[in-house]
A protein has these predicted regions:
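Bacterial N-terminal signal peptides that target proteins for export
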Residues: 2-14, 20
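C-terminal segment of classical bacterial N-terminal signal peptides
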Residues: 17-27
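Contiguous segments within soluble domain cores/interaction surfaces
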Residues: 28-130
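Intrinsically disordered, low-complexity segments enriched in polar/charged small residues
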Residues: 9-13, 27, 54
């Protein structure tokens, strides 16, 4: 093997390595979990709450086109409540979504926020309602 052959093989190997990285990087980035934060606000109606949900990716950028459902329940009272699932809709700014739900009593609640698109992510947020 001449030095020239060796250089060609090295160059080919480096190119292959680099292009594999370029091809695989987006696939890995898409499977990284999303970060889901929320704030709850009271509306005029007793026990009704409006949620503002903020979804960001692993790089901290807002995630648009997310599909989000919120299911609330009381951890201390399994099977006792049946608040309908709430679907969140875009709230005007990238990565922000809003939804409303009405609780059935005051006390400790837990919300399961489930993102099904673009990356499956599930978070649970506990909160107190008075
Ligand atoms: Cu209850």
């Amino acid at each position: 093997m001449t030095a020239r052959h060796f250089n060609r093989i090295t160059t080919a190997a480096v190119l292959l390595f680099v292009s594999a990285g370029w091809l695989l990087a987006p696939a890995f980035a898409q499977s990284e979990p999303l970060s889901v934060e929320w704030t709850l606000a009271k509306t005029g109606k007793r026990l009704e709450r409006e949620a503002l949900i903020i979804v960001t990716n692993a790089q901290g950028q807002p995630v648009s086109d997310a599909s989000i459902e919120v299911k609330v329940d009381m951890p201390s009272m399994p099977m006792m409540h049946a608040v309908p699932k709430a679907t969140a809709t875009p709230a005007g700014q990238p990565g922000r979504y809003k939804t409303k739900f009405t609780l059935e009593m005051a006390g400790e609640w837990a919300a399961q926020i489930e993102v099904t698109k673009p990356v499956r992510t599930k978070v649970v947020k506990k909160f107190n309602a008075d």
